[in-house]
Amino acid sequence: EDNDPLKVEGLGTVESNGDMINSIKNDKYGIGYISMSSLEDSGLKGLYYEGVEPTEENVLKETYTLTRNFNYIIRSEYENIEKEQIIDAFLAYLGTQEGKTTMQSEGGILEVKASDPTWDSIKDNYAITLEDNSDITINFGGSTSVSKMAQSLADELSDLCGNVNFSHNYHGSSDAYK
């Protein structure tokens, strides 16, 4: 279906946070959205929403509510059980202290708690991680906003999961994997 008739005159689309930053800087009346991790060095001003300043602390306290989550989506069916087990291990890794620390270091806004499991405390639940998985490739794609985070997580998990390979293909939030 053609949505062009619904677009407002002057509306533009961009491919990345960097493109959005440049577009807004070059448009006196521009407004857009970027990842909060990109805001600090952008030279742009974050929008106060309902009187609350856009800070990581306020996002974590849930007082700044003009936010969006990044969601991983996975297949409902797999070509083999090994890929399913590796994805299960990856999803578990996301909830560990190590996984959360990596997400945080790549601009993710989340808390790492002492009560979060460590990878060492849960890895025995994922026997696939003890096998040689160097002949298996898992595909990642989606938003360029999380590409560095996903690449860092995949690099870590590859080392922890029998050298499984990860293929990265990012185009934007709406594209998923191409």
Where are these predicted regions, by residue range?
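Exported/periplasmic ABC-transporter solute-binding proteins
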Residues: 1-178
